[in-house]
């Protein structure tokens, strides 16, 4: 009898309704997979042209107890393990000396192995029903009707949905129905780039990595590198945003030479292998570090069911590896709430998810922010952060 009541409650909550997920990143796609497992009608609207679009960025590591739990629930954990690579860390100084190495012990190889972003997307896409993801959809307007949302896309037909889940990243432009909070810059800046065939194009630095990720710091300049990102070496350089950049970035990221000149000046007394990395790079991406603070409660009155997951909900500095993992926990909790029959309405299920998310999301943001503060102190070393 109890089973019958639970099933009826679930059907009353979800039957004859459709869900629109905005954004086809790992969090949005995982959300779609978890909903489909429960027979929910879901569509993902993604601005990329197609599944072959290359995703820029470093590898992702899914943590035990958070990101991996969502993959397990989706039935994809072993596939993730098959494609992910356990990687150690080399910590170097500005002269290119290896100060310490933290290797992955065999018993820890599944703790948080690194996976290429496109590989993770492929795992998730291959698990979804055909035509779940609708490509080349840039959302320009979200409007509530009497019973459904209307989604308006740039130069594409409009769609409707009973529930909208925003998973379209930290710079989402359609949060107004959920909160008036705005994204804030934290005061640090990141420059990222890829070098293909690094063993040929920057052999000195590639050998310094020796198959591991590499981290180096000096006087507030931080360098992170991963030599194994599907044939490319991905690296990032982080520093406090210069005062003269407060109103406008003084480096033209459309002009490679402008970026190279700036970085060579910043790294003038670093080893030639670091300069080799800069000289070899063909293009750079510059990004201010941002946070979407969870300080104010979200709106309790919304015209129709809508919520946010992933960076759209809790963008944070990338200095604790918590972003994607927190987002996958979002997907796990929200999908359970919507499908397990515990709640009498979508609004109740969403509210409970948001209450939980605010707790672990704030904690993750605080950890990331504290790491950011510590890492940009002049005397910071990666040994103290990694306990090696």
UniProtKB/Swiss-Prot annotation:
Localization annotation: Cytoplasm
Signal peptide start and end residues: none
Main location: cytoplasm
Catalytic activity: a tetracycline + NADPH + O2 + H(+) = an 11a-hydroxytetracycline + NADP(+) + H2O; tetracycline + NADPH + O2 + H(+) = 11a-hydroxytetracycline + NADP(+) + H2O; oxytetracycline + NADPH + O2 + H(+) = 11a-hydroxy-oxytetracycline + NADP(+) + H2O
E.C. code: 1.14.13.231
GO biological-process terms attached to the record: response to antibiotic
Any one Gene Ontology cellular component term annotated for this protein: cytoplasm
Keywords: Antibiotic resistance, Cytoplasm, FAD, Flavoprotein, Monooxygenase, NADP, Nucleotide-binding, Oxidoreductase, Transposable element
Binding site for NADPH: 54
Binding site for FAD: 61, 117, 311
Gene3D superfamilies (alphabetical): FAD/NAD(P)-binding domain (3.50.50.60)
Cofactor(s) the record lists: FAD
UniProt xrefs under InterPro entries: FAD-bd, FAD/NAD-bd_sf, TetX_monooxygenase
Similarity comment text for this entry: Belongs to the aromatic-ring hydroxylase family. TetX subfamily.
Subunit structure: Monomer.
Protein function: An FAD-requiring monooxygenase active on some tetracycline antibiotic derivatives, which leads to their inactivation. Hydroxylates carbon 11a of tetracycline and some analogs.
UniProt-listed PANTHER family: FAD DEPENDENT OXIDOREDUCTASE DOMAIN-CONTAINING PROTEIN, MONOOXYGENASE ASQM-RELATED
HAMAP family: TetX_monooxygenase
Other remarks on this protein: Activity is not seen in B.fragilis, an anaerobic bacterium. Activity is seen when expressed in aerobically growing E.coli.
Protein name: Flavin-dependent monooxygenase
Lineage: Bacteria, Pseudomonadati, Bacteroidota, Bacteroidia, Bacteroidales
């Amino acid at each position: 009898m109890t089973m019958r009541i639970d099933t009826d409650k679930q059907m009353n909550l979800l039957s004859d309704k459709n869900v629109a997920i905005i954004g086809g990143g790992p969090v949005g796609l995982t959300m779609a997979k978890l909903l489909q497992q429960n027979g929910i009608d879901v569509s993902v609207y993604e601005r990329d042209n197609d599944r072959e679009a290359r995703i820029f960025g470093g590898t992702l590591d899914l943590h035990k107890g958070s990101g991996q739990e969502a993959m397990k629930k989706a039935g994809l954990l072993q596939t993730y393990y098959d494609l992910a690579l356990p990687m150690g860390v080399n910590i170097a100084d500005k002269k290119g000396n290896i100060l310490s190495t933290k290797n992955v012990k065999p018993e820890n190889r599944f703790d948080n192995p690194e996976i290429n972003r496109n590989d993770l997307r492929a795992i998730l896409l291959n698990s979804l029903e055909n035509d779940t993801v609708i490509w080349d959809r840039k959302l320009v307007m979200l409007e509530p009707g009497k019973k459904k949302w209307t989604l308006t896309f740039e130069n594409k037909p409009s769609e409707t949905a009973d529930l909208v889940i925003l998973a379209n990243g930290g710079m989402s432009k359609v949060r107004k129905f959920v909160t008036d909070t705005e994204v804030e810059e934290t005061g640090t800046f990141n420059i990222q780039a890829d070098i293909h065939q690094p063993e040929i194009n920057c052999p000195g630095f590639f050998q310094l990595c020796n198959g591991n990720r590499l981290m180096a710091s000096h006087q507030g300049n931080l360098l992170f590198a991963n030599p194994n990102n599907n044939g490319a070496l991905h690296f990032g350089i982080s520093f406090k945003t210069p005062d003269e950049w407060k109103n406008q970035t003084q480096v033209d990221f459309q002009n490679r030479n402008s970026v190279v000149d700036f970085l060579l000046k910043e790294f003038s007394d670093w080893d030639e292998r670091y300069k080799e990395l800069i000289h070899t790079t063909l293009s750079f991406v510059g990004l201010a570090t941002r946070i979407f603070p969870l300080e104010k409660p979200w709106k309790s009155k919304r015209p129709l069911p809508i919520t946010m997951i992933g960076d759209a909900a809790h963008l944070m500095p990338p200095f604790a590896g918590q972003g994607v993992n927190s987002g996958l926990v979002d997907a796990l909790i929200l999908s359970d709430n919507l499908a397990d029959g515990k709640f009498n309405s979508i609004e109740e299920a969403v509210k409970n998810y948001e209450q939980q998310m605010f707790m672990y999301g704030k904690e993750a943001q605080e950890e990331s922010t504290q790491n950011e503060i510590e890492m940009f102190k002049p005397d910071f070393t990666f040994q103290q952060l990694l306990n090696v």
